[in-house]
Structures are given as structure tokens and as C-alpha cells.
């Protein structure tokens, strides 16, 4: 089913570019452009395929923005991520995104006027309101300042009992920063208690071990969260969140991402905040992917992924709706951006046959997020989506090659089959392995991604097609935190501070192949090109003029 409304789906023919060329569209996840040093894993890795797209080709290789306002985020200090990146790549326009939507709703007070808040506030008088999410200022999944505003807003509007279930980060922010975030939160909760609100932390754990799994990779992660948050059960019990985080971090090999689950107990050893009948629950992450599974456990009556033991009758709302197709959760505090008329929908209406493929951890990005936060096909007769199962139960630095080869082989076969006009893939290696902070493994990951690129480029060469190679945001190109002078930062013990997050770096885009018409080159007159410019570019290469409200195409055709 397509978008509703009276839309003229017919795209005009491009006056200079032909139809009928097979386009291989490759998105390298977490592949930015940075200075070539020992902490740039892309530089350290042998990447002959990607090098060949850049070297001596100034007209068909350039950099574009993948962070901040270019992808709908509030400021230039906001790192891009795969969700907003693929939204921009597929939509061809810039939409206010997660954090920005929430900021606007909080600033205007609209968040307290909409149906989601009215729904949960019915529990304020007699029940507890529980806030669950990532305690971080990373701005990728959540932001601490938004949680602080929610706590204040809930208390001012009648919440008498508040419990916070924290997930420590160490992925989008520095490992060890959890202690400072907990101290800040505890001070806010103490201020609420001074005003007569019963407010405290109830449970916690590291984001990668408790609650925040995605794409149904490992339900035990969600179960650990459920056990702590709902049942009040965890292997570790503490009197305060600060004691919990400090103690668990002191264990050998411990880090914020993988802290074990814990509950806060009173003097009698009883959990201070399990979720019970009549309570309200808010998951305060604004990014969708790592909240969907938990939302299913909280909302679905016929949930069967693990034994929930006890299913309380609650009022649940997400900060945002995390899956528009599943309408999950059914209640939310802030309405999502309405992304319509995506490039995929236009191309389907114009007969373009599309194949999309990645492995589990990024499959949703080349499909759901690319298509404007929409599940399913626009036209089942013209589209085929293939998901390759990701390795589960391991950290990706253990298998840094991931499924790059398998993705490339699927893409190659799709290109050579002649059945598709566009073959679109995401190669997750640079991002997923980069997040582990393992520099040597990330070098291997980048090499594997480059080999996959070569396989796809070779297939495009065979069919006389066109390649478009780009990325969704940076990560693997800079693996250390830096001081103001740009030098690698050290901690108090003199150890290198590893960077596991995304970056603010631009990403490359390259076009070429035997099917690229003579005279096609990147324009130099676009002031700040970004990911949203890619959709119109690809439409041009398919032989169409993009819709007039799309961000400008990156290419022009000059007479040679």
C-alpha cells in the first residue's frame, strides 16, 4: 500500500540521462572521512576498492554531511545515526528527527497536551510512573536533559511516586561516564523528594546486556530488563544507584555497556520499584530500534518470547512511536515525523524494480527506515527484500567480517539476474565493530566491507551498470576521543580514551561504472550537501527528474 492522498506519482524523464541502467547502491555503515592516522581504521585497513573510487576522480567522488541539521537533528554537535541517516537517504528531504521533535514538544509544552500524556497521567494519583531508558547525554538514543524535564513536568502535573529504571551507556559516550549521569539524576530525584514526591532509581544495567536489544537478536537481553523492572529481581541488589554503578564497574573487565542488571532495595531487602497493576510506564528513548522489543514485552498480550511471569495492567507510552507499521507502542508522548513520498515509493510507482539486502542488525535500515519508517513493500511485484541473519550471542569484534561476504554475494546475484533496476545494500561492519572500541577488529571489519564493495562493483561492471557508494554516518574513521587541539585524549591514568560512538565527520559518496553517461559529474555549487541530496541523485541516474521539493541532486551533466 502506498501513501494516501492525491499525489502525482509520475516522474518526468530526465532530459539528458537514460533509463534502464542497473544501479548498485551501497551504504557503508559507520564509514566517515577523517585524517589518516593510527586511530583511523579505514586508513589502516587495506581498502583498494574504496580507494579506487576516490583516487584521481574529483568529478565523481566527494564528501557530504551526515550529522546535525543535515539529517534533521537539532545542532551541529549532534552525531548522525543509522536511523536518521537512512531516513534522509530514502526520503530526499530533511525532517525534524527524534531529539528535535522531543525538544520542540517539551519547549512548547505540547507534550503535556497530547493524548499520550493524558493517558499515563491517569496513574499519577494512585499509581507510580516509571521512566525506563538510556541515561546518557549522547543524543543518539536519549538525552539526560529531556529526562530531567520530564521528571520536573510529571511532578508539577501531579505525579506523586516516580521510579527511574536506568540503562548505562558507554557506547555513544565515554565508558565510565555513567557515574556522573547517575549523580546528576540522583540530585534531581533528591530535589523532587524535598518537594514531597516519592522519587528514586529502582533498577538498572548496561544497555547491551539489559533491555536494549534490537531486531530480535537476543531476547534474553530484554528478559533481564523485564525481570529487574517489572519483577524486581536481579542478581545484584544495592541501596542506591550510585553504589550499584560504582561497585559493578569495579569488577574486572566491567564497562558501562555491559553492566549486569541490578535492583535497588530498601532496608528490608525489598525492591523499591517493581512495576505493578495501575502504574504508568514511559520509555524515554527517542530512537526506535532498541526500544521495539521491550515495547512488545510491555504491550503485547500474546507475547511469547520469554516467560514474563507476571504481566501488570499498566498504562504504557513511548517517548515516540517506535514502529509505525506495527503501531507500537499504541500510545506515545510525541508524534513521529510524517515522512511521505519517499524515493522508494516514487520509484515503485514508476516501474523501477528494487532489491534490498543486509544482515539483521541493519536490515531495517535499508527497508523500514529507508522507506520513511514504514514496514513492508510498496509493490510486492517489483520489490524483494532479503535479510541475512546476523551472528547472535557474541560481540561483533569476535567476528568482525560479519556477513559482508554473504550480503555482497546476494547483491551480485541480484545484479547479474537482470531482474532488478536498483540493488541496495547496507554493509554494517564499520559501525557495529567500531562500537566495540576494538581497533584491530575494526580494521578487519573495514577490509571485509571493502572486499564486499569490490564484489558488487565487479557485478555492476559486468552488466554495464552504475554504482553509487556512500555511508550513513561516521564511526570507524576515528576511534579515540580527542582534546581541543585534536590530539588523542588520555584518562587520569594516562590511558588512551577509546571512542565507541559515531562521529561528526562527513561521509564519502562516489558514482561511476560503465553505465554512467559521459559528462556526469558532481556539482560544486551546492552549499552544504548532505545525505538528503542522495535520493534525487539516484533518481537522476535512473533517468528521472526528482520531485521539486526534494533536496537538490548532487550531479549535473556537462557537454564534453
UniProtKB/Swiss-Prot annotation:
GO-annotated cellular components: apoplast; cytosol; plasmodesma
Keyword Cell cycle: no
Entry EC no(s): 5.4.2.12
Enzyme class: isomerase
Chain sites annotated for binding Mn(2+) 2: 29, 82, 472-473
UniProt cross-references to Gene3D superfamilies, sorted A to Z: Alkaline Phosphatase, subunit A, BPG-independent phosphoglycerate mutase, domain B
Disrupted gene: phenotype observed: No visible phenotype. Plants missing both PGM1 and PGM2 have no detectable phosphoglycerate mutase activity and show defects in blue light-, abscisic acid- (ABA), and low CO(2)-regulated stomatal movements. The double mutant ipgam1 ipgam2 exhibits a severely impaired vegetative growth with pale reticulate leaves and don't produce pollen.
Gene Ontology MF: a single term: phosphoglycerate mutase activity
Subcellular location: Cytoplasm
Pathway as given in its UniProt record: Carbohydrate degradation; glycolysis; pyruvate from D-glyceraldehyde 3-phosphate: step 3/5
Required cofactor(s): Mn(2+)
Keyword Metal-binding set for record: yes
GO biological process, one term: response to carbon dioxide
Catalyzed reaction equations: (2R)-2-phosphoglycerate = (2R)-3-phosphoglycerate
UniProt subunit comment: Monomer.
Family: Belongs to the BPG-independent phosphoglycerate mutase family.
Name of the protein in its database record: Probable 2,3-bisphosphoglycerate-independent phosphoglycerate mutase 2
Amino acid at each position: 500500500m502506498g501513501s494516501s492522498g492525491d499525489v502525482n506519482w509520475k516522474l518526468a524523464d530526465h532530459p539528458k540521462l537514460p533509463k534502464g541502467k542497473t544501479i548498485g547502491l551501497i551504504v557503508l555503515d559507520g564509514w566517515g572521512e577523517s585524517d589518516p592516522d593510527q586511530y583511523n581504521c579505514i586508513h589502516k585497513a587495506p581498502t583498494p576498492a574504496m580507494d579506487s573510487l576516490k583516487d584521481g576522480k574529483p568529478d565523481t567522488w566527494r564528501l557530504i554531511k551526515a550529522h546535525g541539521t543535515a539529517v534533521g537533528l537539532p545542532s551541529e554537535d549532534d552525531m548522525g545515526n543509522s536511523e536518521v541517516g537512512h531516513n534522509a537517504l530514502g526520503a530526499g528531504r530533511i525532517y525534524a528527527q527524534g531529539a528535535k521533535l522531543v525538544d520542540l514538544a517539551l519547549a512548547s509544552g505540547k507534550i503535556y497536551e497530547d493524548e499520550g500524556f493524558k493517558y499515563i497521567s491517569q496513574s499519577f494519583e494512585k499509581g507510580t510512573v516509571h521512566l525506563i531508558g538510556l541515561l546518557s547525554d549522547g543524543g543518539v538514543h536519549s538525552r539526560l536533559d529531556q529526562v530531567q524535564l520530564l521528571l520536573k513536568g510529571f511532578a508539577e502535573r501531579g505525579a506523586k511516586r516516580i521510579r527511574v529504571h536506568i540503562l548505562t551507556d558507554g557506547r555513544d559516550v565515554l565508558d565510565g561516564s555513567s557515574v556522573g549521569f547517575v549523580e546528576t539524576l540522583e540530585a534531581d530525584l533528591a530535589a523532587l523528594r524535598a518537594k514531597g514526591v516519592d522519587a528514586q532509581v529502582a533498577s538498572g544495567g548496561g544497555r547491551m546486556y539489559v533491555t536494549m536489544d534490537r531486531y530480535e537478536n537476543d531476547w534474553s537481553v530484554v528478559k533481564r530488563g523485564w525481570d529487574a523492572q517489572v519483577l524486581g529481581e536481579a542478581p545484584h541488589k544495592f541501596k542506591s544507584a550510585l553504589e550499584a554503578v560504582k561497585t559493578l564497574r569495579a569488577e574486572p573487565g566491567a564497562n558501562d555497556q555491559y553492566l549486569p542488571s541490578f535492583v535497588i532495595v530498601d532496608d528490608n531487602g525489598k525492591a523499591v520499584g517493581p512495576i505493578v497493576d495501575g502504574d504508568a510506564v514511559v520509555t524515554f528513548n527517542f530512537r526506535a530500534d532498541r526500544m521495539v522489543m521491550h515495547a512488545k514485552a510491555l504491550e503485547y498480550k500474546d507475547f511469547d518470547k520469554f516467560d514474563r511471569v507476571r504481566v501488570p495492567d499498566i498504562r504504557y507510552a513511548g517517548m515516540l512511536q517506535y514502529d509505525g507499521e506495527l503501531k507500537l507502542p499504541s500510545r506515545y508522548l510525541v508524534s513521529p515525523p510524517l515522512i511521505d513520498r519517499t524515493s522508494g515509493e516514487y520509484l515503485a510507482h514508476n516501474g523501477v524494480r528494487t532489491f534490498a539486502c543486509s544482515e539483521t542488525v541493519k536490515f531495517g535500515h535499508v527497508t523500514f527506515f529507508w522507506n520513511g519508517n514504514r514496514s513492508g513493500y510498496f509493490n510486492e511485484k517489483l520489490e524483494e527484500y532479503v535479510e541475512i541473519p546476523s551472528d547472535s550471542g557474541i560481540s561483533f569484534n569476535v567476528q568482525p567480517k560479519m556477513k559482508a561476504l554473504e550480503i555482497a554475494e546476494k547483491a551480485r546475484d541480484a545484479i547479474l539476474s537482470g531482474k532488478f533496476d536498483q540493488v541496495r545494500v547496507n554493509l554494517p561492519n564499520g559501525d557495529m565493530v567500531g562500537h566495540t572500541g576494538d581497533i584491530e577488529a575494526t580494521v578487519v571489519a573495514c577490509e571485509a566491507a571493502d572486499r564486499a564493495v569490490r564484489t558488487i562493483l565487479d557485478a555492476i561492471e559486468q552488466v554495464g551498470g552504475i554504482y553509487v557508494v556512500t555511508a550513513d554516518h561516521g564511526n570507524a574513521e576515528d576511534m579515540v576521543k580527542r582534546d581541543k587541539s585534536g590530539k588523542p585524549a588520555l584518562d587520569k591514568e594516562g590511558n588512551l580514551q577509546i571512542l565507541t560512538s559515531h562521529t561528526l565527520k562527513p561521509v564519502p559518496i562516489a558514482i561511476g561504472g560503465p553505465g554512467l553517461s559521459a559528462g556526469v559529474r558532481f556539482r560544486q555549487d551546492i552549499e552544504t550537501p548532505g545525505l538528503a541530496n542522495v535520493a534525487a541523485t539516484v533518481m537522476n541516474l535512473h533517468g528521472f527528474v526528482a520531485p521539486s521539493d526534494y533536496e537538490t541532486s548532487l550531479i549535473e551533466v556537462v557537454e564534453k
